[in-house]
């Protein structure tokens, strides 16, 4: 039943007698735990590859994606829009900012799924600094008395 070319898998919950054939496991860049090396794949096939400079660029890119996601979250707040603006324009602006923020956030999630420890830390620090700068109380002028 077991050969070097294919593996026969029988599903335990399948009541019929059919089987599936699968190719043997191939090594890949996906890791089941955090990987702390610079040879990884983030967001795109083959990027950043095994170049340390490109890995540093990937970390900076993920950091700024997370940072900008926090800025866009602040832009989509109701308090960031002028009081006299048209209600439909307010809703359209907030919806557009929320949509772009969601796209950036999903890109950050996809980058973190690479299971690279550096990418994870870049995403966390980008979100933390972005929150502190754009939504934290420390940098708001109206909260300072």
Curated annotation (Swiss-Prot):
Record's function text: Involved in the transport of copper.
Subcellular location: Membrane
GO cellular component, one term: membrane
Gene designation per UniProt: COPT4
Keyword Iron: no
Similarity field: Belongs to the copper transporter (Ctr) (TC 1.A.56) family. SLC31A subfamily.
Primary localization class, coarse: membrane
Keywords: Copper, Copper transport, Ion transport, Membrane, Transmembrane, Transmembrane helix, Transport
Organism: Arabidopsis thaliana
InterPro entries given in the database record: Cop_transporter (IPR007274)
Protein name per UniProt: Copper transporter 4
Topology term for the membrane: Multi-pass membrane protein
């Amino acid at each position: 039943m077991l050969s070097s070319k294919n593996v026969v898998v029988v599903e335990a919950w399948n009541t019929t007698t059919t089987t599936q054939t699968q190719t043997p496991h191939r090594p890949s860049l996906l890791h089941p735990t955090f990987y702390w090396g610079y040879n990884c794949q983030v967001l795109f096939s083959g990027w950043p590859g095994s170049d340390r400079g490109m890995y540093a660029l990937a970390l900076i890119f993920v950091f700024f994606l997370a940072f900008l996601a926090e800025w866009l979250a602040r832009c989509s707040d109701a308090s960031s829009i002028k009081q006299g603006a048209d209600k439909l324009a307010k809703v359209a602006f907030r919806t557009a900012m929320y949509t772009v923020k969601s796209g950036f956030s999903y890109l950050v999630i996809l980058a973190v799924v690479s299971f690279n420890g550096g990418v994870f830390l870049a995403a966390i620090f980008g979100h933390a600094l972005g929150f502190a700068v754009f939504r934290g109380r420390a940098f708001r002028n109206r909260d300072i008395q």
